[in-house]
Amino acid sequence: MLTHLRPALVLLTALTAITGLAYPLAMTGLAGAIFPARAAGSLIERDGRIVGSALIGQSFSQAHYFHGRPSVTTATDPADAGKTVPAPYNAANSMGSNLGPTSAVLAERVKGDLAALSAENPGAPVPVDLVTTSGSGLDPDIAPEAALFQVPRVARARGMPEDRLRALVTAQVEGRTFGVLGERRVNVLALNLAVDELARR
């Protein structure tokens, strides 16, 4: 019986070492050598400190910043570990809301967001990105139309001409991946950092 078990155990050990240790370590080393910034998490640094990642959205609620998509991520309630509380852009608990199209809770949230956005920019159609969440709750990007919709609010809050901000948004637009995958997009963190830089000039 041992003669039958020995080859199986040797194969199990060899495959575990190859697929569980050698391959992941080789890929990590290769990624670090070829794409060092991406392998480190695509971190964005300003003035010697890390301000975020280009891959994970952040919560911006101030009027002088562009806002990302709504996030419905949660965190454990400090008062009751059996419950959760809203914690937008909580990277430790990436998820969507799981609310379906017939959900009254979802309908009320969208209506509230639509009303607030319509009051902010009357007469302009509200882009869908600004009222819908992403599957992860951590989407760092919005459509160019969603960024342009917010230009009047940011311009008023910063005392800047709208045309300068529109030009900045246009300059921040990233094309489709490989020219065919996904949609054109604007990274909200990168855009807000560019707005801060423009305001300092």
UniProtKB/Swiss-Prot annotation:
Keywords: ATP-binding, Cell inner membrane, Cell membrane, Ion transport, Membrane, Nucleotide-binding, Potassium, Potassium transport, Transmembrane, Transmembrane helix, Transport
Intracellular or extracellular location(s): Cell inner membrane
Superkingdom of this protein's organism: Bacteria
Example of a GO cellular component annotation carried by this entry: plasma membrane
Pfam family membership, one: KdpC
UniProt-recorded Gene Ontology molecular function terms: ATP binding; P-type potassium transmembrane transporter activity
Residue ranges crossing the lipid bilayer per the database entry: 7-29
Bilayer topology annotation: Single-pass membrane protein
InterPro entries linked: KdpC (IPR003820)
Quaternary context: The system is composed of three essential subunits: KdpA, KdpB and KdpC.
PANTHER family for this protein: POTASSIUM-TRANSPORTING ATPASE C CHAIN (PTHR30042), POTASSIUM-TRANSPORTING ATPASE KDPC SUBUNIT (PTHR30042:SF2)
General function of this protein: Part of the high-affinity ATP-driven potassium transport (or Kdp) system, which catalyzes the hydrolysis of ATP coupled with the electrogenic transport of potassium into the cytoplasm. This subunit acts as a catalytic chaperone that increases the ATP-binding affinity of the ATP-hydrolyzing subunit KdpB by the formation of a transient KdpB/KdpC/ATP ternary complex.
UniProt record similarity statement: Belongs to the KdpC family.
Name of the protein in its database record: Potassium-transporting ATPase KdpC subunit
Species name: Methylorubrum populi (strain ATCC BAA-705 / NCIMB 13946 / BJ001)
